[in-house]
Swiss-Prot record:
The gene is MT-ND4L. GO terms for cellular component: mitochondrial inner membrane; respiratory chain complex I. Belongs to the complex I subunit 4L family. It is found in: Mitochondrion inner membrane. It is a multi-pass membrane protein. Its main location: mitochondrion. It is an enzyme of class 7 (translocase). This is NADH-ubiquinone oxidoreductase chain 4L. It catalyses: a ubiquinone + NADH + 5 H(+)(in) = a ubiquinol + NAD(+) + 4 H(+)(out). Keywords: Electron transport, Membrane, Mitochondrion, Mitochondrion inner membrane, NAD, Respiratory chain, Translocase, Transmembrane, Transmembrane helix, Transport, Ubiquinone. It comes from Ceratotherium simum. InterPro entries: NADH_UbQ_OxRdtase_chain4L/K, NUOK/Mnh_C1-like. GO terms for molecular function: NADH dehydrogenase (ubiquinone) activity.
Length: 98
């Protein structure tokens, strides 16, 4: 593996660990998800460029579209939660609370 692959894999792992460890605020969770999607986009782009498979050239763009949709939905949920509860805690999303 080259140094670039190792760095992208470490970026994905760091984002995943951040998502698992810092779950109190919704904004930090969204930032970690965006880091994971960016790492996946870079990995998919490198895979397509290295394989020279023309049919798979749309995969990174489709992944980028899904990342943009995920970011838009996450930010709209963040605005709705912060307007309703006044904070962006993830515990406010639990529907089983009394």
């Amino acid at each position: 593996m080259s140094l670039i692959h190792i760095n992208v894999f470490l970026a994905f792992t760091t984002s995943l660990m951040g998502l698992l460890m810092y779950r109190s605020h919704l904004m930090s969770s969204l930032l970690c998800l965006e880091g994971m999607m960016l790492s996946l986009f870079i990995m998919a782009t490198m895979m397509v460029l290295n394989s020279h498979f023309t049919l798979a050239s749309m995969m990174p763009i489709i992944l980028l579209v899904f990342a943009a949709c995920e970011a838009a939905l996450g930010l709209s949920l963040l605005v709705m939660i912060s307007n309703t509860y006044g904070t962006d805690y993830v515990q406010n999303l639990n529907l089983l609370q009394c």
